[in-house]
Amino acid sequence: MSGYSAPRRISDADDVTSFSSGEPSLDDYLRKRALANHVQGGSRCFVTCRDGRVVGFYALASGSVAHADAPGRVRRNMPDPVPVILLSRLAVDRKEQGRGLGSHLLRDAIGRCVQAADSIGLRAILVHALHDEARAFYVHFDFEISPTDPLHLMLLMKDARALIGD
């Protein structure tokens, strides 16, 4: 995308102080925990910048989901719990929203998940949407809603591959 850096791993040199997505929990995560979680191996955080300032980010972590919480296509022929990769956070600064950056970051995250699935067993990508608007964003990208929580959504790895043209 024009004007934005390619998503890359967060570093201590990144300016996150003015980041404001409109979601305090996401802003606080980026400012207070993203780098430490990244360094300590709890998650991997990727940022994109404009003019030297972080304007978007996402975080990935390993996880699992119980059969009862997974849509039928996700749990079919899988162990319980089902191995997944968790897209734990995704946010765009308010000043950059509405320009396609969120979609770009999601596609980048999906691409990294597909690469990971080539090396380890992963059935799906799991997200915990914060609210109905976020859920609609993920549904637009073919994420399926959990039968037990309408804000938990999953994307099968085969659908992820199709989405990014892999």
UniProtKB/Swiss-Prot annotation:
Pfam families linked: Acetyltransf_1
The active site lies at Y138
UniProt cross-references to InterPro entries, sorted A to Z: Acyl_CoA_acyltransferase, GNAT_dom
Note the effect listed for Y138F.
Decreased blockage of in vitro translation. Loss of blockage
Reported induction: Part of the probable tacA-tacT operon.
Return the annotated region ranges for Disordered.
Answer: 1-22
Identify which top EC class this enzyme belongs to. Answer: transferase
Which keywords accompany this UniProt record? Acyltransferase, Repressor, RNA-binding, Toxin-antitoxin system, Transcription, Transcription regulation, Transferase, tRNA-binding
Q: What catalytic reaction does the record list?
A: glycyl-tRNA(Gly) + acetyl-CoA = N-acetylglycyl-tRNA(Gly) + CoA + H(+)
- The residue ranges of the N-acetyltransferase domain are 1-162
**UniProt keyword Ribosomal protein present:** no
What are the protein's GO molecular function terms? acyltransferase activity, transferring groups other than amino-acyl groups; tRNA binding
What is annotated about its quaternary structure and interactions? Homodimer, forms a complex with cognate antitoxin TacA.
Its family remark reads: Belongs to the acetyltransferase family. GNAT subfamily.
Question: What name appears for this protein in its UniProt entry?
Answer: tRNA-acetylating toxin
**Organism name:** Mycobacterium tuberculosis (strain ATCC 25618 / H37Rv)
The top of its lineage is:
Bacteria, Bacillati, Actinomycetota, Actinomycetes, Mycobacteriales
